[in-house]
Swiss-Prot record:
Signal peptide residues on this chain, from the entry's feature table: 1-6
Subunit comment: Monomer. Interacts with and forms tight 1:1 complexes with RNH1. Dimerization of two such complexes may occur. Interaction with RNH1 inhibits this protein.
UniProt protein name: Ribonuclease pancreatic
Disulfide bonds: C32-C90, C46-C101, C64-C116, C71-C78
Molecular function per GO: lyase activity; nucleic acid binding; ribonuclease A activity
Database matches in InterPro entries: RNaseA, RNaseA-like_dom_sf, RNaseA_AS, RNaseA_domain
Cellular location(s): Secreted
Family: Belongs to the pancreatic ribonuclease family.
Keyword Secreted among record annotations: yes
């Protein structure tokens, strides 16, 4: 049973929107269309861009103790992964309109930058890939 989105913590939202440790890579071109829908990012509108990380939750949590960097918004609670991780970028295609959210799926190996907070200190926001 998934918790209602209203009671979702920032850490739980991060997991829902960005974690997919079940697959090492997303070879299917329809991966983003399926996952964006399954993870509730196409309700009411199409989320324009989203990144899924194909690593264990423990490995992504560990980024919070790696290199401290500035976030895009100027805050100082972002952390960059030491190594490149398997990720999938989902980008809304230019002509796609809600409710027909149609995404381009692209796979990469990149360093991720996440914002971390709380106790335990865990990712709550996906900031960037480099």
């Amino acid at each position: 049973v998934q918790p209602s989105l209203g009671k979702e913590s920032a850490a739980m939202k991060f997991e829902r929107q960005h974690m997919d440790s079940t697959v090492a890579t997303s070879s299917s071109p329809t991966y983003c269309n399926q996952m964006m829908k399954r993870r509730n990012m196409t309700q009411g509108q199409c989320k324009p861009v989203n990144t899924f990380v194909h690593e264990s939750l423990a490995d992504v949590h560990a980024v919070c103790s790696q290199e401290n960097v500035k976030c895009k918004n100027g805050k100082s609670n972002c952390y960059k992964s030491h190594s490149a991780l398997h990720i999938t970028d989902c980008r809304l295609k230019g002509n796609a309109k809600y409710p027909n959210c149609d995404y381009q799926t692209s796979q990469h190996q990149k360093h991720i930058i996440v914002a971390c907070e709380g106790n335990p200190f865990v990712p709550v926001h996906f900031d960037a890939t480099v």
